[in-house]
Amino acid sequence: MLRARPSHRLASAAAVVAATGAALLAGSSPAAAATCSDVDVVFARGTGETPGLGVVGGPFVRSLTGELSDRTVTSHAVDYAASSSQASAGPGATAMSAHVREVAAACPSTRFVLGGYSQGATVTDIALGIRTGTTTGTPVPAELAGRVAAVVVFGNPLGLSGRTIATASSTYGPKSKDYCNSSDSVCGSAPKTGTGGHLSYASNGSTTDGARFAAGLVRAAGTPTTPTPTPTPTPVPTTCVRDSTRDHVAADRAVSLYGRAYARGSRDSLGATSSYNVVSLQQVEGGWRLVTAC
């Protein structure tokens, strides 16, 4: 759970983001097109930012699109309030996971890159099933975890508790990267990855580096495979013949061995080869078997 002091830091950082957002806000990429893309980037903006990808998400998506120039890349800005109270992170996580579920169902070959900045990183944490102690939301279903190729977050408040996604999630940790600048108090004691403060991720190379990281994992993941339906076996025509033992032998439905007849394949005993007793044989895969009647 976030302590009172870190919450003040978050509020202060949020005010700075809101005040400078108009100057720094990058244009959001278009939402996912009607046709399915190879990669869909789902990004949550920071506290107080204008709806869209935000000051960090925009540059990150542009860099990732450039890194994956041989693939189709779409982006989706998570629709949530990004309020200063941080309580909107839970509903934001629910919105993020809902988008992943919707696209995954419609586009079985699409891979996802999830990410967020500041409170948007908390949105991402919760969507990955990480308990943050601030609010709750609906995570991405476990069965879709394999469709998420990479997770990249910037200025993640999870660092205030000394954690990163890599240490908090065994499922998503190996394919995640947390960026926390040396002077960024919002991400607390998380390992430092670059210079500057909470507003420097788009200008200090973090978004470019994060895009390279995500692109590498997207390429390594390949294309999701759609399970091949199990073919319905072709029914074997059922034939049943009622005849004398000797006639079954004559028709090769039975074999004779030392004066006794046996159904071909199953070796069911039919009695003496020369017998005129009438018995029923049913055709099965690989031969015939003795049945009570046809």
UniProtKB/Swiss-Prot annotation:
Record's description of how this protein is used:
Shows promising applications in improving the surface properties of natural textile fibers.
Q: Where is this region: May be involved in substrate binding?
A: 240-294
Which parts of the sequence are annotated with region: Disordered? 222-241
Q: What is its main location?
A: secreted
Name the cystine pairs: C36-C107, C180-C187
pH note: Optimum pH is 8.
Check the record and name the Pfam families matching this protein. Answer: Cutinase
Q: Which UniProt keywords apply?
A: Disulfide bond, Hydrolase, Secreted, Serine esterase, Signal
Mark out the compositionally biased spans (Pro residues).
Answer: 226-236
Transition state stabilizer, annotated site positions: Q119
As recorded in UniProt, its EC number(s) are 3.1.1.74
InterPro entries xref list: AB_hydrolase_fold (IPR029058), Cutinase/axe (IPR000675)
Signal peptide: which range, if any?
Answer: 1-33
Catalyzed reaction equations: cutin + H2O = cutin monomers; a tetradecanoate ester + H2O = an aliphatic alcohol + tetradecanoate + H(+); hexadecanoate ester + H2O = an aliphatic alcohol + hexadecanoate + H(+); a butanoate ester + H2O = an aliphatic alcohol + butanoate + H(+)
- Do the record's keywords include Disulfide bond? yes
| Active-site residues (renumbered) | S118 (nucleophile), D184, H198 (proton donor/acceptor)
Which GO CC terms are listed, alphabetically? Answer: extracellular region
Q: Where in the cell is it found?
A: Secreted
Protein family according to the UniProt entry:
Belongs to the cutinase family.
This molecule's function is given as:
Catalyzes the hydrolysis of cutin, a polyester that forms the structure of plant cuticle. Shows esterase activity towards p-nitrophenol-linked aliphatic esters (pNP-aliphatic esters). Can depolymerize synthetic polyesters such as poly(epsilon-caprolactone) (PCL) and poly(1,3-propylene adipate) (PPA). Exhibits some activity on poly(lactic acid) (PLA). Can bind but not hydrolyze poly(hydroxybutyrate) (PHB).
Q: What is this protein called?
A: Cutinase
Q: What organism, scientifically named, is this protein from?
A: Kineococcus radiotolerans (strain ATCC BAA-149 / DSM 14245 / SRS30216)
